[in-house]
Each structure stands twice: as C-alpha cells, then as structure tokens.
Amino acid sequence: MQLKFKNGKFRILQVSDAQDLQHVRHTMMRMLNKAYDDLKPDLIVLTGDNILGNHLNDCELWTPLFVKDKPSEMKAMGVAIDKLISPIEERKIPFAMIYGNHDDRNRMTKDEQADFYRQYSCNIGLDGTDSGDCDTYNIPIYSENGDKIKFNIWMLDTAWHDKEKDECFEYVKPEAVEWYKDTSAKLKAQNGGVPVPSLMFQHIPMLETLELIEECDSADKDAVRGPDNKYFKLKPECQGHLGEYVSAVSQKTGQMEAMKESGDIKAVVFGHDHQNCFTGVVDGINFVQTPCASFRCYGNFCRGVRVFDIDEATGDYETFTLTYNDIVGKSLWNDLCYIWDADDMVKKKIALIAGTAGGLLAIGAGVTLGLLL
C-alpha cells in the first residue's frame, strides 16, 4: 500500500499505550472511534503496549480463569488485538504498529503476534527482515502523484521479552541503529543527496530525554519524584506536562549520533510514560512525548491521542494532543464513564458507588418512614 500526500498535507494520528485486553474498556474505544471519525487521519501509528500482553490470562469478575496454555493465550491475544484494530479496519485507515514492553510478555513470539496484525488489509509495515525485528521498519510517504518519496516514517523496536530468562530488555538494538543509518543513506541518495525529512517513532524514550528535565525543590508545583527521592520538572524551554519521572531505555547504542549524522529526523516520538505529554529539543532534534490512551492502567488528565500534520512542500510538521474530554466533550455522562473505566480513578469510583448506595438507602428509608406514618 503506497501512502501519498493529499493536497500537500498528510495527517498521522498516534495512539500510544492502548494497553487493553480481550475485555476492552469501552470508554477508550469510544474515545478512539470518535478521534478516528473527527480527525480523519491518513495513517494511524500504534506506538507500543498495544495490548497488555502479560495479563492475557486475566478474566472478568465472576468468570473462571480460562487461559491455561499457548493456544488459549493466543486466542485471547487475537481477540484483544481485534478489539483494537477492527474499528480502524472498518474505516479503511492505514495503520502501522510497533511493540512496547508489555506486548510480548507471554508465550508468543513477536512474529507470531505480528501475524494477527498482518491479517488486516489496512496494515502497513511489519516487514523488518533487514533490520532484525519485524517491528523495525520504515514507511515512505510519496508525493500526490506517487513519483517521489517526500517524507519518511521510522518505526523502531525498543523492548523484547526473553522467554527463557523471563526478562525484559529495553533499548534499541545496535543492529537496528546500523539498519537505520544504511536505509537513511539509501533514501538520501535516491533523493539527490538530500536527506528525506522523517519522524521516528519508538515506544520507550531515549536516555537523552533526561536532558529535558532538571532537579527542583519538592515544593515546586510541577515537581515529580525521581530516583533517590529527588524531584524534577521540565526545563523552562520545554512545552507540556511532566506527570512522572522519565522512564528511558536502559542503555545508549549510538542512536542519537546516527540521527545527527543522517540529518533526516525532524522529531523522535515516544510513548511508555503514561502521564507525560511534552515536547523539547535535544541537540537540534525535537523530542516528543505522548501520553497513554488506555483506561486499563494508570494515567492522568492528558490521556488521549497525538496528531502530526505534515506539510509536503517544506517537510515540516505541526503536532498537538487531544485529551479524552477534547474528543468526546465535557458532560456528566462522559465524566462518569471516565471515572468508571480508568484504573487511576478507583478511589473516586468507590466514593461514587458508596455515595449512590447511601443515597438509595436514604431514599428507601424515607419511603419506608412515609409508609409507616
């Protein structure tokens, strides 16, 4: 499938950390479906932790545990992925995906899981045979007449689960960096010696992201707790919200040097940190952090999606985020749905249930007293 600019524009919708199961949280899907309809993206990128792969054996309340082996776990995985992808497929929107640190923490390999995504006609990519990982690949975006690559999307894997060691590794593999350098050079050569402007998506933030935060006093209104009981906030030149300390990859493998050498990266875009939503610049490259979409995990008021609008003529982009309330609107019903489905709203949910129960008891007592009188 060839992606093309339309009237000089191309819109990407990023959904990060959808992180759900076969029993999907309906509030997230309602938010995403409305975002798809309202924003009309040319491409949807799912940037990791698309499913909660290490909890596929979880069950609904009052139902027995039904995932006991690989075939049943694979079935649960297929249902979870279908709940996320079917709305995209129904709208015939091209989509691309990468894995996060939760997707393959189960009995399935990444390639086995990729087969579920590949069965959808709107899937782009997952063909990283040269890069070493199925979810490390690039997506060219062509001019409207299809004769020239005008922009490029890089998708890089940052986490994988070693089944034998039962251990998760979190960094960009050195061979992936080499693949990026080689492929970027080929695209540059095809473009008359000029780097093809690009966005790079990966799940876990680069270690260089830590250069965008600074230590501060615990009393600072923007402070978040970090290692060694120290507190941090975004540097003044950054824009957005720091809701938690940056959880970056475990090691550097030459990625930053490769990006600067290649000269094609307009921005590198991350997910993973559910409560962070900010942008900043490191060594001339834009760093973009996108919050989670999931309700089956911790999060905050930033929960939503991110949009990238790319201009064909300049190769530049504009980006913005939309929160749950931006997308579905502000109303009592939408607020109740949010409280009911979001894992970080458990205390409010309990208070809501208790308050409702107390109100019903009071009404019942009043009716009973009225009958007695």
Put a short name on every predicted segment:
Residues 350-372:
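Hydrophobic alpha-helical topogenic segments used for membrane insertion/localization
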Residues 9-19, 150-160, 201, 286-292:
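Active-site-proximal beta-strand elements of phosphoester/diester hydrolases
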Residues 1-2, 138-147, 246-247, 253-262, ...:
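Binuclear metal-dependent phosphoesterase catalytic core
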Residues 1-4, 65-194, 258, 307-309:
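Extended active-site neighborhood of metal-dependent phosphoesterases/phosphodiesterases
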Residues 1-78, 82-83:
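N-terminal active-site segment of His-dependent metallophosphoesterases
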Residues 39-43, 152-154, 166-274:
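His/acidic metal-ligating clusters that form di-metal
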Residues 1-28, 189-195, 201-214, 218-248, ...:
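Mobile, glycine- and charge-enriched loop segments
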Residues 21-23, 52-55, 97-108, 161-164, ...:
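Active-site environment of divalent metal-dependent phosphoester hydrolases
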